[in-house]
Structures are given as structure tokens and as C-alpha cells.
A protein has these predicted regions:
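Short helix-loop-helix/strand-helix junction enriched in hydrophobic and basic residues
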Residues: 116-123
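Catalytic core of pol beta-like nucleotidyltransferases
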Residues: 1-113, 125-131, 141-197
Length: 197
């Protein structure tokens, strides 16, 4: 006999599923117990019941995203860093947070002449970790030499705090070809980045 979840419980499990996934996107190298995970994901979200978190963890484990080791009565939960969610869902997660936090507007305020703003590096690829900084490239007109700048820090990046934002301001005329190739493989979040063969 198959039992269906009642609608409020199904919504809680779906919310917990996303919260657990997002927590491991923010802390991909951490090992955590079930109780600690429940406390961690309840910081921003509603307070989830332990059984709801257990259901979400089991579902993500069945999908291969999480790995669980049972140590007596305790679970040690880690994420599978080679799972496709780190290259698909995590990139979308990162992009959403970057855009929703007003980074584009902040860059345009500082560089109104920006031709393009690009998210590149580890956040673009989805292989960022707890220690990673956000890398933003800003293309401007002219012949200025490339310049590394600090764009401040995001107070909250999902479950992480105070994530630094590094900027690379460059003009097409003065950028190293290898650096430009890295930027060109990023995601254009404002304007248009012309890539000439």
C-alpha cells in the first residue's frame, strides 16, 4: 500500500530538501550530523522537524548528492562533490544570489561606463567552497591596464557570511589573452561581451 504525504508535510519536505541542498552548496567540504544540519538550515528558514530533515537527507542520498555514514546513533552527512547538482543547480543558485544582492547595480554605480559585467571563476563553475571569493569582471572602453579591485563583501550568501567580492576591471585592448579566455567562459550578467576569434 502506498501512502501519500499530506500537502503541508509535502511542502515542508520540499522546503527542507531545497534548504539542505543549498546548505551543502554553501559548505561543500563540511561534515555534519542530522541534528546540527537541522539547526543550521533553520537559521533563515522555518524550524524544520528532525523527521522532515531526515526525509530530505534520505531523498538527496538516494539521488547521490549526499553521502551518509552511520556512527552508532549519529549520522555523518557529506556531499558528493562530483555530483551533477554542483555543476547545474549550484551555478543557478550562485547566479541568483549574486543578482538578487544588487552586485550589478553596485558595479554600475562605481563604473557607469561598464560595457559588460561577468561572473567568472569558481562561482560560475559551481566548484566554489567555504573559502572562495566571488570573481566579477568589468569590461570598460579605452586602453586602461587591468586593475584588481575590491567590491566589498556580501553580508549573506545563502548560509555563508561575509563573502568577499573581487573585481577585475579591464579594457579589451590591454587584457592578457589567457585571462580573457577565463572571463569569456563566465556568465555575462550585464551588457554584452564581444568575443572575437
Amino acid at each position: 500500500m502506498t501512502r501519500k504525504l499530506k500537502e503541508p508535510h509535502r511542502q515542508a519536505v520540499n522546503g527542507a530538501y531545497l534548504s539542505v541542498m543549498n546548505w551543502f552548496f554553501c559548505f561543500p567540504r563540511k561534515e555534519v550530523s542530522l541534528n546540527d544540519l537541522r539547526d543550521e538550515v533553520s537559521v533563515f528558514d522555518e524550524r524544520y522537524a528532525k523527521t522532515t530533515i531526515r526525509t530530505a537527507v534520505s531523498q538527496l542520498e538516494n539521488e547521490g548528492f549526499l553521502q551518509r555514514q552511520v556512527l552508532g546513533r549519529t549520522w555523518r552527512i557529506t556531499t558528493n562533490l562530483s555530483h551533477s547538482y554542483h555543476r547545474s543547480f549550484k551555478v543557478g543558485h550562485n547566479l541568483t544570489i549574486v543578482i538578487e544582492n544588487g552586485i550589478i547595480e553596485d558595479v554600475l554605480e562605481e563604473y557607469p561606463q561598464a560595457r559588460a559585467i561577468i561572473l567568472f571563476g569558481s562561482y560560475r563553475k559551481g566548484d566554489d567552497t567555504e573559502e572562495s571569493d566571488i570573481d566579477i569582471a568589468v569590461e570598460i572602453s579605452g586602453t586602461a591596464d587591468p586593475q584588481m579591485i575590491s567590491l566589498g563583501a556580501l553580508e549573506h550568501f545563502g548560509y555563508r557570511r561575509k563573502v568577499k567580492i573581487n573585481g577585475l576591471v579591464f579594457s579589451r585592448e590591454k587584457i592578457d589573452l589567457n585571462v580573457f579566455a577565463n572571463i569569456a567562459n563566465g556568465i555575462v550578467i550585464y551588457g554584452f561581451l564581444e568575443v572575437k576569434p
